[in-house]
Amino acid sequence: MTRPRPLTAAGLLVAAALVVATVLLAGMAAVGTGRAGDPGGAGAARSAPAYTPSAAGTLRGLAPAGTLIGTAVDPRGLNLDPAYPGVLAAEFNAVTAENAMKWRNLEPSPGVYAWAGGDQIVDLAHRNGQAVYGHTLVWHNDVPDWVSPDWPAQRLREVLRRHVTAVVAHYRGRVWAWDVVNEVLAEDGSLRDTLWLRKLGPGYVADAFRWARQADPDARLFINEYGTEGRTAKADALLDLVRRLRADGVPVDGVGFQGHLDAERPPEDVRGNLRRFAALGVRVAVTELDVRVRLPATAEVLRRQAAVYREVLRACLDVAACASVTVWGFTDARSWIPGYHRGFGAACLFDADFRPKPAHAALLDELVARRRTGG
């Protein structure tokens, strides 16, 4: 299959080698004033030990040619955590803006765009030889306060069209794929009751894809959803929606499966689920992977977490149409999980002091095993 642009596989490998060499030479001496273990809520600067890549290698260095292993990026980490940029550059060959490209952050007032946060991430990614996945264009959350539900449908549609067009055009040629619509399904598989559905009708989904295609014909366009990683009723509904959209000529190029998982309740048959979507002729991607555990995180709990991470990566690698696996942040220092799932945390590959956890080792082991077997 054709893989993400604009970076070639060879270019990614060269960039990976250069980045890892730079990190090793620099030693990543880290200084700071933050409190270790703070999940990033205060936004304070942090201290952490020096980062040294595993003797086995790095995720990006071991990834099969053409496969992206990415992470969501938090600008607070870039700006406040001395160890963060080095781990980001050495371990991952793709990035997603965690929040910087969401509408509320990009357009705080009508027609006034705040590109700095997104531009910082894109510029850094290209210096690091990393592909960029855009997130997200149309969502029911993070809509600016100035967008009024009282507007007539025609005005609301035009504002949404202008938003999608402006953002995709701004990053044209620098973002390989976009989450065009995000979380459009309710738990029962029907279209979610949102401002967009109530005012514009179900056609807003197709409209968003067509606007994005016009703004950047080369970007790959994804629909992104949670609770659909395994064979669930919601996944069945998503499969049917994608099939209908493509039958109507809507340019849906890919399906993103978020992957916010619980270590004690992993999804069933991720591999088979990815394959049935791929059979529609679309790419598939794991877009927001984290595996939360109930605290305290014992050694046994972290072992189970590692097994879930490895199984998701294995499922993607077994499906030719799977373009990427992206973790939703790589350090517990900046994870969103504790703020939204009470009693849970430790969801990432690195702990709050940027030390790799068993889950990171499990992913490396899977990649090394693939290299040995040629799989």
Named regions from a protein language model:
Residues 13, 23-61, 65, 369-375:
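N-terminal low-complexity, Pro/Thr-rich disordered segments
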Residues 51, 72-83, 103-116, 185-189, ...:
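Acidic-and-aromatic substrate-binding clefts and catalytic sites of carbohydrate-active enzymes
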Residues 90-99, 182, 215-225, 238-265, ...:
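Aromatic- and acid-rich polysaccharide-binding/catalytic face
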Residues 75-91, 157-167, 233-245, 308-313:
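Short, acidic/polar
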Residues 53-61, 107, 145, 149, ...:
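Aromatic-rich peripheral "rim/lid" segments of glycoside hydrolase catalytic domains that contact
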Residues 49-98:
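Boundary/entry segment of secreted carbohydrate-active catalytic domains
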Residues 1-16:
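N-terminal export and membrane-targeting signals
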Residues 52, 90, 94-108, 117-230:
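Substrate-binding cleft and catalytic face of glycoside hydrolase catalytic domains
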